Every structure is written in C-alpha cells, then in structure tokens.
C-alpha cells in the first residue's frame, strides 16, 4: 500500500502536513521517503521492518546497496531514495559548521563529527581548525588506517595548523568497533599533540572519540587540562 492509498488524514504524509515532523515516529518519517510499501505491507510497515532488520536508522542509511536490496520490496530506486535522504542530512550538518561559524555549541560539534566519522569502516584521524574567536576555518582528515601513537605525527599537525593560521583545534578520530571508550594509546596521542601545539601557542580544546552511538570528550573528562 502506498501513502497515497491511505484514508484521508491517516497516512504519515498527511500527519506530517497537519502536525509537523515532530510527532512522527522514525518509521513514519521513513515511510514518507519510501512513498510505497509492497504487497502485504504498508509503507510504514516496510519502514518498520527495515529499521528493525538493520538495528536503527543510521545503520540502515549507511548500509550498502547489496544489503538493502536483499530486503523484500527494496530495489535500486528505493536505495537511491535512502541515499539521497542521508546525504541531505549530512550536507545540512556540514552547512551548520561552515567556515566562519562560531563554535559555541558542543552538541553541534558532536552532531557534525558523528555524521562525518561514525559510519567509517576504517579509522580516521581528523582535525577541526579554529581561529582565535573559535570560528571554523576548516575540517581536515589527516590520517587513515590504524590510529596509534606511531601513526599520528605531531609534526604534520603543527604544519597544518601553521599553514591555516589556526589559534585553536579540536582533534577527533573514530573507532570502527563502535565502542567510543578511549584507549591508552588515544590518551598518549593527545598528550603528545597538546605538548606540540603548546610550543606554537595553539590551544588543544578537545579530543573527541566517535563510536557508533556516542562520542567521548577528553575535555569533559578533564583529560585536556
């Protein structure tokens, strides 16, 4: 059953237009994106099955085409609809943290980093460069692969900071395992970077470790001071 076949006022699209997006469940919002269900399943039921099968919206939206198209009723067209919705969400997040934006909201930073790094199958070490008023200069991915104290070079970080004339930075990396808890190696890297940045009078504001569903902040744990 497609959304257009729902009785007047009962479909998720009509509910959205009447009440706004807030009252809609994840399955109802996804049904609006999918538009149609399959034989024996409404669009909402199909959406609910997809979310349940993949374990959540983020897992569904980051799944491969092969994984999604294995599901009954899902093909290349519906996969493209999901990818478009996911990309729009990511681009909105990028615009919220665009160059010149004053970084005063920790939740905004968390949301941005989660969207950038949480779905990576490999480790990425990145840096958010800020000016003296904590306005965004640039987000740069520096290293990929196994991130440990031997693979992150403070010299490269310092060179980038000097090149971009940054006054403060937030470093971050993801854990593909999904567990955000920092390792001993993560803490060692942070200490080395903090020392290197202090030599050029640049502040290390935070080191954030991104997992599947959470971000651990070194600053919040008191590990930066």
UniProtKB/Swiss-Prot annotation:
| PROSITE patterns named among the record's database cross-references | MPN, UPF0758
Gene3D superfamilies (alphabetical): 5' to 3' exonuclease, C-terminal subdomain, Cytidine Deaminase, domain 2
Q: In what residue span(s) does the MPN domain sit?
A: 102-224
- SUPFAM superfamilies tied to this protein: JAB1/MPN domain (SSF102712), RuvA domain 2-like (SSF47781)
Q: Do you know which InterPro entries this protein is assigned to?
A: MPN, RadC_JAB, RuvA_2-like, UPF0758, UPF0758_CS, UPF0758_N
List, in alphabetical order, the GO biological process terms annotated in this UniProt record. proteolysis
GO MF assignments: metal ion binding; metallopeptidase activity
> Where do the annotations place Zn(2+) binding?
173, 175, 186
Q: Family per UniProt? A: Belongs to the UPF0758 family.
| Pfam families linked to this entry | RadC (PF04002), UPF0758_N (PF20582)
The protein's UniProt keywords, in alphabetical order, are:
Hydrolase, Metal-binding, Metalloprotease, Protease, Zinc
Residue window of motif JAMM motif: 173-186
List the PANTHER family. DNA REPAIR PROTEIN RADC, UPF0758 PROTEIN YEES-RELATED
Q: Which organism is it from?
A: Shewanella sediminis (strain HAW-EB3)
Question: What name does the UniProt record give this protein?
Answer: UPF0758 protein Ssed_0385
């Amino acid at each position: 059953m497609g959304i257009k076949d729902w009785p007047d006022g009962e479909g998720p699209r009509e509910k959205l237009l009447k009440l706004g997006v807030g009252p809609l469940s994840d399955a109802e919002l996804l049904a609006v994106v999918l538009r149609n269900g399959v034989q024996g399943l409404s669009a909402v039921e199909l959406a609910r099955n997809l979310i349940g099968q993949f374990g959540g919206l983020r897992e569904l939206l980051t799944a491969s085409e092969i994984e999604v198209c294995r599901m009954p009723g899902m093909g290349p067209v519906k996969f493209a609809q999901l990818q478009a919705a996911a990309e729009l969400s990511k681009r909105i997040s990028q615009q919220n943290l665009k160059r010149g934006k004053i970084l005063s909201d920790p939740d905004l930073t968390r949301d941005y980093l989660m969207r950038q790094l949480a779905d990576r199958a490999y480790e990425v070490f990145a840096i958010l460069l800020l000016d003296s008023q904590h306005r965004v200069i640039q987000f740069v991915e520096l290293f990929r692969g196994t991130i440990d104290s031997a693979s992150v070079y403070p010299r490269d970080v310092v060179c980038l900071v000097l090149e971009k004339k940054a006054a403060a930075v937030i470093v971050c990396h993801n854990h593909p395992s999904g567990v955000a808890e920092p390792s001993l190696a993560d803490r060692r890297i942070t200490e080395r970077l903090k020392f290197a940045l202090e030599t050029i009078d640049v502040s290390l504001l935070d080191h954030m470790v991104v997992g599947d569903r959470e971000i651990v902040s070194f600053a919040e744990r008191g590990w930066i001071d």
